């Protein structure tokens, strides 16, 4: 019989096994081709070129995506080869050489790859338009997205999947040449671990795994404390090592120990539900520990990165407001022309004028006593003051007397990393003038432009009018003296006002610093700053969400494939149980528990990993934690639930067919 006939007969016979592997290939090609096609879409490129890191971001995401695809396909191929191990053993028994078997399977793989690449590229071509529309929606760009076929994306994908095919063929050849004939017949049915009595050492190691995870979580909450900031990199390595190592020990020892304890408490009186749930988990935990650890860590990392990116995107409005606390900001009396144009166009607005006066102070003096050894405590900088009467225009209830001050405009990551305390005295100076402020309250309300506060988030002192008048004797030492905040009464006027703001050059400010040098600054409008934030963060949130989806689909599919493989291995056991009288619903109760563990435990631990990772440094990315975190987590829970339902459905099919 010729090789071609053998290939056709083999593929026809193994059709029920191939669809799983074939789906993995098609899914991988679709993901990769749609993403590289997206990079070469002219409408998309025109929208993202405003971001200086667009090219680097797309390239980095492409490499990560290729790693995901490589990992996914190699794992699927490994499961596929394991399920065909008996067939490969039979080929050797009838006299076929290992070289001939390798050629036979190589031809099958090549045919599968060619078919998967063609179908995957077609699916990727059509799905790329959907992804392009999503990206433009995230960027708030209006553009007509056309179906664009990129020859560059085609060539890149063909090269990548040719390399992947070569790697798969090497993996397959290695497995055939390095596995004994006897092991081929037992590979699909051998128990992973014989359950023995647990030793005290195993119990200690299992408990140690839990302690390591808890310590990693605790250390993550202290990661950005001032006391540990100097050893940030070392602390991050320790946290990674303890959480990943602890996760492995939990899966390798803790889970099996807990299951064995439950079994022993029943004193041998195990129900069919216990047999089908507890026993398989215990037997397979040795080999599953590595894969479950990897899946858990990948879930935590992908969810954490996706959540942090979403926090940054979600907080783009708050971030813009911290730098531009009003629809428009006019500095140093240089926006009169803009106000005239607003009145000419009958655009109604509210106006608040703030007088500004700089002082020199070391705000670190407001830190807690345990932090006063930190070098930041003695660093002096320019901080601006505003009179109470101006502040009361936006906060009418504010009250001060004597040397009392309110510290406001202080929030975001600055307030999280360097928390300040009220009821402290602070010595400030302005030229030869020196005053002692008593801070009675700290507000996070933004009132002054980020240009004045050196980037936004910097503090502002609200002082009594008498104190402010005294400080203005040193006005010549500081560049900023006046700010006008404009808030439009109708959002419908924003687009027109934006054009007038640009036409009047109201955002171009010239100021003279304390050294007599003239500098030019560009003050954005709130809407302009918000759109800049979205343009710079939109691509990041899209690529991280895309990669997060790829990671999630990969880990979920691997769990699903693994459960399908285990279901086939346990088919004979279900046949015996059905023949001795157990109903389908009795068997399915144990399977429900088993699937709840296989999908639920990695998901729960992964969610905990991502929660503590995000909680440790979310304030560096935005101002809102709860909503983005819950939205991202719910998406992950929903998709994992779908995979669990599919897995249960497959088990139900196997149980029904077992008789």
Q: Language-model segments: what does each one mean?
A:
Residues 37-47, 51, 116, 121-153, ...:
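Short helix-loop junctions at transmembrane helix boundaries
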Residues 1, 5, 178-195, 568-569, ...:
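Short cytosolic juxtamembrane segments of multi-pass membrane proteins
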Residues 49, 55, 316-329, 477-478:
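Membrane-proximal juxtamembrane linkers immediately C-terminal to transmembrane helices
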């Amino acid at each position: 019989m010729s090789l071609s006939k053998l290939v056709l007969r083999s593929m026809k016979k193994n059709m029920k096994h191939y669809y799983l592997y074939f789906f993995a290939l098609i899914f991988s090609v679709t993901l990769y081709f749609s993403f590289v096609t997206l990079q070469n879409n002219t409408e998309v490129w025109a929208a993202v070129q405003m971001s200086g890191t667009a090219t680097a971001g797309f390239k980095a995401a492409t490499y990560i995506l290729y790693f995901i695809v490589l990992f996914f396909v190699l794992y699927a191929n490994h499961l596929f080869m394991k399920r065909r191990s008996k067939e490969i053993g039979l080929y050797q028994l009838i006299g076929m050489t290992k070289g001939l078997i390798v050629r036979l399977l190589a031809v099958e793989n090549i045919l599968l790859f060619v078919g998967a690449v063609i179908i995957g590229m077609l699916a990727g071509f059509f799905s790329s338009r959907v992804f392009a529309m999503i990206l433009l929606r995230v960027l708030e760009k209006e553009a007509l997205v056309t179906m664009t076929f990129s020859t560059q994306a085609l060539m890149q994908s063909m090269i990548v999947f040719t390399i992947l095919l070569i790697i798969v063929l090497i993996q397959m050849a290695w497995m055939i040449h390095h596995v004994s004939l006897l092991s081929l017949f037992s590979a699909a049915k051998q128990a992973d671990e014989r359950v023995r009595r647990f030793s005290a050492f195993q119990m200690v190691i299992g408990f140690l795994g839990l302690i390591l995870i808890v310590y990693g979580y605790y250390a993550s909450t202290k990661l950005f404390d001032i006391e540990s900031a100097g050893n940030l990199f070392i602390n991050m390595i320790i946290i990674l090592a303890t959480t990943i190592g602890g996760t492995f020990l939990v899966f390798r020892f803790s889970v099996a120990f807990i299951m064995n304890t439950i079994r022993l408490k029943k004193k041998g009186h195990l129900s069919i539900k216990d047999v089908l749930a507890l026993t398989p988990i215990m037997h397979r935990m040795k080999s599953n520990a590595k894969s479950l650890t990897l899946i858990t860590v990948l879930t935590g990392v992908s969810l954490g990165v996706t959540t942090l990116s979403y926090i940054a995107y979600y907080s783009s409005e708050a971030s813009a407001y911290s730098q531009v606390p009003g629809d428009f900001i006019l500095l140093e009396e240089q926006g009169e022309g803009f106000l005239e144009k607003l009145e000419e166009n009958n655009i109604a607005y509210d106006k608040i004028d703030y007088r500004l006066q700089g002082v020199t102070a070391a705000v670190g003096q407001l830190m807690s006593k345990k932090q006063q050894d930190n070098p930041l405590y003695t660093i002096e900088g320019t901080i601006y003051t505003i009179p109470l009467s101006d502040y009361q225009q936006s906060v009418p209830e504010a009250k001060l007397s004597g040397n009392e001050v309110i510290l406001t405009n202080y929030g975001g990551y600055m307030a999280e990393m360097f928390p300040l305390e009220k009821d402290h005295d602070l010595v400030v100076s302005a030229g030869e003038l020196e005053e002692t402020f008593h801070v009675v309250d700290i507000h996070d309300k933004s009132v002054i432009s980020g240009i004045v506060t050196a980037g936004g988030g910097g503090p502002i002192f609200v002082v009594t009018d008498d104190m402010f008048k005294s400080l203005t004797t040193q006005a010549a030492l500081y560049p900023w003296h006046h700010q006008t905040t404009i808030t439009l009464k109708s959002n419908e006027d924003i687009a027109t006002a934006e054009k007038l703001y640009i036409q009047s050059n109201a955002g171009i400010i010239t100021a003279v610093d304390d050294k007599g040098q003239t500098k030019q600054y560009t003050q954005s409008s709130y809407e302009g700053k918000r759109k800049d934030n979205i343009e710079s963060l939109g691509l990041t949130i899209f690529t991280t969400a895309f990669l997060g989806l790829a990671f999630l689909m990969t880990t979920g599919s691997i769990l699903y494939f693994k459960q399908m493989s285990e279901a086939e291995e346990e088919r004979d056991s279900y046949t015996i149980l059905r023949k001795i009288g157990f109903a389908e619903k009795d068997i399915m109760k144990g399977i429900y528990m088993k699937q709840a563990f296989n999908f639920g435990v990695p998901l729960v631990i992964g969610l905990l990993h991502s929660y503590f990772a995000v909680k440790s440094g979310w304030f560096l990315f935005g101002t809102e934690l709860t909503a983005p975190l819950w939205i991202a987590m719910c998406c992950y829970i929903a998709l994992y639930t779908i995979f669990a339902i599919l897995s249960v459905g497959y088990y139900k099919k196997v149980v029904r067919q077992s008789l």
